[in-house]
Amino acid sequence: HSCFAGAVCSAGGYVLCDGKTLVDIPMEPQQAEGVRAALERHGVECTLEARDATFGGSKMTERWKFIHKKNDAPLNSEAERWRKAMEEGMSILPLSDYKGEPLYKIVFIADHESDLAEAKRLYADQFVFCESKLDRLTDGFVNGELINRKFDKGTGIKAICDHLGCTLADTIGFGDS
């Protein structure tokens, strides 16, 4: 394999190589519903990332548009990635269009770090809460994503190596975050 088309998506939860799905580990439905409810009880805004679509509430979309418009301000890498995606026409489907598709990732924005406390208490054993502070933009926002502890980008790269019969030393990786 001198050249191939491979991708490690959703922090390693969905991995493709040579037209084959190597890893497909969405959140368990009750897990996704529970952590989402714990976040929303505290006003945390979420986008739900399914394999083929991203869903978000109007507040989340408006907040990302605000960040997009502030493109002269310094942003953390996650906010910069979203700003660029919005600039290039990425659309977030309305949350009302979500019909229970398997979720691979939940991205969040909280007004305060303390808004995440209940979700962390209940789900820290199942998810890594990957957080970035947006303090430079407004008063204390925290953005981030939930990454399932069953996988990570490294296990996704390893799955591709196993498929191709190569070692990690033979790889070059690049990505959006």
Which residues does each predicted region cover?
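Active-site phosphate-binding/coordination module
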Residues: 1-74
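Active-site metal-binding loops of divalent metal-dependent hydrolases
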Residues: 12-13, 175-177
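Conserved acidic, metal-coordinating active-site core of Asp-based
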Residues: 49, 53-174
